Amino acid sequence: MYSEPKQDRSKATEEAFLSALDTLLVQTSFKNLSIEDIAREAGISKGAFLRRFGSKRQALYVLYDRYCEKTVVVMDRIVSELPLKEQATESLFDMSKSLERLIKEDYSCNRAMREDFQENLEVHPSTRRIFLYCVEIMRRTQKRFFGVTNETGAYSAAQILITNTFEYVFNAMPGLPRDYEQRHKLMAEILLVALQAGDIGTSK
């Protein structure tokens, strides 16, 4: 069972292993990476790695949690700036470009987590937490600009934003505009429609 290191030496050991893992993930897939490779890159024994993490998968999860912590900081900033936006598309544009930047900055870690999901079909708790926070931001966006919220729109917009951005970064959506501004403006317009999904098809 993994637990956060408390002593300076243990913290330094963990940092060395995570840095090695992050470096190696740039060069190879998570599946083809061995504990021996990580230990060799870190210059520390395989036994020390197993004592610290227990498994290669757990080490990836620790690295991924750090990415999620950075993501939450950005999401907090988006929430704090929401009252300053004059139009919903301004905030949605910000969400789109911010998420793309975050995924690209930690591309290797996100790619490895994608591998892990495809192999194990398990959603990591931090992934679920980020998704639900994104849903909450969509609710706040609805409340700010429409005066009401609806769950269909909030969940739909969050899903579209996260899934489409990930797939674009991983080169699975070549049909989207290559131009940065155009791409994120398009995504903002799509999200605006999605936020109102609960109202589509209804009439009074």
Language model regions located:
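N-terminal intrinsically disordered/low-complexity leader segments
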Residues: 1-12, 199-204
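Helix-turn-helix
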Residues: 12, 16, 24-58, 62
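Short, basic, alpha-helical segments at the C-terminal edge of helix-turn-helix-like DNA-binding modules
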Residues: 35, 65-72
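Hydrophobic alpha-helical connector segments
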Residues: 62, 66, 76-105, 157-161, ...
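Amphipathic alpha-helical packing segments from all-alpha helical-bundle domains
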Residues: 72, 76, 102, 120-146, ...
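Amphipathic alpha-helical segments used for helix-helix packing
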Residues: 98-125, 170-174
